[in-house]
Amino acid sequence: MENYIDTVAAMGRTVIVTGTGNNGSQPWHAGGILQQGKTEEIQLAVGAFEPTLNVQLWKDYEDEMEIYLESPSGERIGPLYERLGPQRHLLENTELLIYYGKPGPYQLSQEIYIDFIPEGNYVDSGVWKVLLSGKRVRSGQYFLWLPGGNVLNRGTGFYSPRAVGTLTIPSTAGKVISVGAYDSRQNAYADFSGRGSQFLPIRKPDLAAPGVSISAPVPGGGYATVTGTSFAAPFVSGSAALLMEWGIVKGNDPFLYGEKVKAYLRKGAQRVGGYEEYPNAVSYTHLTLPTNSLV
């Protein structure tokens, strides 16, 4: 999807704006740096009455890692080896289906997909463990994902989740303007707002805009107080429209679109409080229309 959006963004006089998602404070993402000869343990809590579950493990394809899986009772399988087709293992009353993916024409990473299928009605609850042992490591970075969108029961999630790297698609596309949310009253980044990572090939998010307790119109008339990056993105799309009107419609700059609009918005942005390094995992800074940059 990112490649398609980047292609569309390069056609005509367009600017594409998207929110970074609201997974920053959720326990659905974990990750780290695995060193050669070392072992990392990732603990996953599975709540009661979880009918199904899957974990996506992403790593650099050139890194060789031994993977072990341990059930709440201490039963363990591994090391797992890469091979074509699904691997089936039974731990307690849960069957594990494991698929090793391959790199593709547009990515260097490898996905290892782990599906938890209960023999009865529910996945065994308790603390599951994923153990990674570095065998032949170059970069060592790895990320684990659980399904988002509130499809999991309360109590299911990683014990040590990471906020960095919680951008949602399509905010990971390079030529879009990816917008995080901040609390304009406190001048503080919103904890739920999706964050970027130093391991991404490009720095994201691009900007932060007000996304906490925003007064917005609702269907049927009236207003309501809303929160989320979906309500931060319109501030930036409106600002982009004003810049394009000034440049294209009013004849001041017929080329004011695409990455040029993004560059102007970045330059005019101000820093969000609480951070010493800019740009960082939360954004370049928060939105301010760059009127001084246009003259």
Label the predicted regions.
Residues 158-221, 225:
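Conserved, compact domain cores that house catalytic/ligand-binding motifs in diverse enzymes
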Residues 11-13, 51, 62-65, 173-175, ...:
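Subtilisin-like serine protease catalytic core
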Residues 278-284:
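Short, intrinsically disordered, charge-balanced linker/junction segments flanking boundaries
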Residues 285-291:
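Conserved small/polar residues in nucleotide/adenosyl-binding loops
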Residues 55, 64-66, 72-73, 211-277:
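Hydrolase catalytic cores
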Residues 35-47:
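Non-catalytic, beta-strand-enriched accessory regions in extracellular/secretory proteins
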Residues 1-33, 49-79, 83-173, 219-233:
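Substrate-binding/access-modulating region of protease and related hydrolase catalytic domains
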